[in-house]
């Protein structure tokens, strides 16, 4: 058993899986020195033969209906044992292709662990997969939170632009539909932020606190926007003189501090 792992490739050719090892096919190491020598033994090998010399960490990539365990590989028991439950690797590959990156990593870690952690290489790979799943998950959470924050900020800027314009008694004059678009733009961004927040999965404790704070800010902004939408609806239904009088009822306030 090698002390170091290396990568190889798999390809589906005309509906059949084959494996290729460019590393071993390119030469060999002897006495600490690499000798370049082409070896076609490791070119386009069927999975049943390849498993004799190559054991993937994740048994899915054995591409066998009766995958062998790590202990069986150690013991040289590489023949297909059809008394085992059949593993539909083709179906599992389809599932794998449709999984998120995090789910792929978690499923792979589960298979690695199930197949026996019997040496340091396997242990390190399992540790890597679990850490990578956790890191990728957290990166997704942070990315989504930042995306929601950006949408919220855009909404607040648009809202405050509208309020500033309203407090100037809608001067210089714009068409009603253009004024409506100003508040709709703010509402759209706040709603976008709310939708993104709802999609954030399994955040850690510190990020959850930030999410709750942002959610409250979004709810407050939504209430203010609804109030302005109602005011604008009344404004549009009035005549010129009546519209002007609405600006003297009370001055509208800017809202919120955009998130950094």
What are these regions (language model features)?
Residues 2-5, 12, 16-132:
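His-Asp-centered catalytic microenvironments across diverse enzyme cores
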Residues 7, 51, 60, 73-74, ...:
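Extended hydrophobic/Leu-rich segments
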Residues 10-12, 224:
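Intrinsically disordered, low-complexity regions enriched in Ser/Pro/Gly/Gln/His and often acidic
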Residues 137-260:
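Charged, long alpha-helical assembly modules
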